[in-house]
Regions:
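Extracytoplasmic/secreted envelope proteins and their assembly/folding machinery
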Residues: 54-57, 64, 111-114, 129, ...
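Substrate-binding/access-modulating region of protease and related hydrolase catalytic domains
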Residues: 1-106, 157, 165-182, 194
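C-terminal subdomain of the subtilisin-like protease fold in secreted/lumenal serine endopeptidases
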Residues: 1-5, 63, 111-113, 193-253
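Active-site-proximal beta-strand/loop segments in catalytic clefts of secreted hydrolases
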Residues: 3-7, 70-74, 114-119, 135-136, ...
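Hydrolase catalytic cores
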Residues: 6, 145-225
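Short, well-ordered secondary-structure micro-motifs
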Residues: 13-14, 79-81, 124-133, 152
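Extracellular/periplasmic catalytic domains that process cell-envelope and extracellular macromolecules
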Residues: 59-63, 104-108, 132-135, 142-143, ...
Length: 253
């Protein structure tokens, strides 16, 4: 499921909020509380949850459909329900509490949520999260999603080029979690080919088990909002194809 910018609203007309149990009063975006978002002509925008969309995702999972979600490209942290930041919110004129660390729809805790890895490595030689990628404990796996050659429509905002074998088709170099999540889908398809009876929970477990761990740059902090490369408490998991000759992996249900 790809909707990389998700449902959202802007950090405008702010009246106050609450960060980790402490109330605050202000009329502007508070970056020290993790209110980052992406800049648009109408102001800084962040993603929100849509109950009806999330319900549809849960129903698909309950029906046995395997769901992989692009985490989003809004620089925001996604926390889990038990996390310190899950209930952080702000209020704005004419609205109730707006929770900004819960990710954007489509979203489900049982789905596989994928973040984006940059094509350039960190100065220490580790992989690094793409600056714009969502992060935090709510992201399950990171996969390559920067400088990916992909097909695009003939009329879009990207600077497309011709596909050499057939110039009626267009290709473009794209980056984002919408490019990272298909990588996970591909490995997931291989795992399902090996064991087609895997449930969504089992496939998610298999994909997580096959990941490389601690290979991504991390500060070890969960609130260093000024560092756009920080995982902010995210799972340090990098996608690996378990069927590659470099790895040995056995599926057991």
């Amino acid at each position: 499921v790809n909707m990389s910018w998700g449902y959202g609203t802007t950090f405008t007309n702010i009246t106050g909020g609450n960060y980790r149990g402490t109330s605050w009063t202000a009329t502007s975006r508070q970056t020290q509380y993790g209110m980052i978002g992406t800049y648009t002509l109408s102001g800084y925008r962040f993603v929100v949850r849509n109950t009806s969309v999330d319900t549809d995702v849960q129903e698909m999972i309950d029906a046995g459909i395997h769901i992989c979600v692009a985490a989003g490209n809004s620089y925001q942290k996604i926390d889990v329900p038990t996390g310190l930041d899950y209930d952080n919110y702000f209020t704005k004129t004419g609205s109730g509490n707006l929770y900004y660390h819960r990710g954007g729809s489509p979203f489900d805790d049982e789905a596989l949520v994928v973040g984006n890895i940059d094509s350039a490595v960190h100065s220490g030689g580790l992989e690094q999260k793409a600056s714009s990628s969502e992060n935090g404990p709510g992201v399950d796996i990171y996969a390559p999603g920067t400088n990916i050659m992909s097909t695009v429509s003939n009329t879009n905002r990207f600077d497309e080029g011709d596909y050499p074998p057939n110039t009626s088709f267009k290709i473009c170099n794209i980056g984002g979690t919408s490019m990272a999540s298909p990588q996970v889908c591909g490995v997931g398809a291989l795992l399902l080919q090996a064991n087609p009876h895997s449930t969504p929970a089992q496939l998610k477990s298999h994909l997580i088990a096959s990941c490389q761990t601690n290979g991504i740059y991390s500060t070890g902090l969960d609130n260093d909002y000024t560092d756009t490369r920080s995982l902010k408490g995210s799972n340090n998991r990098f996608l690996v194809n378990p069927f590659s000759s470099e790895y040995k992996f056995r599926i057991q249900n």
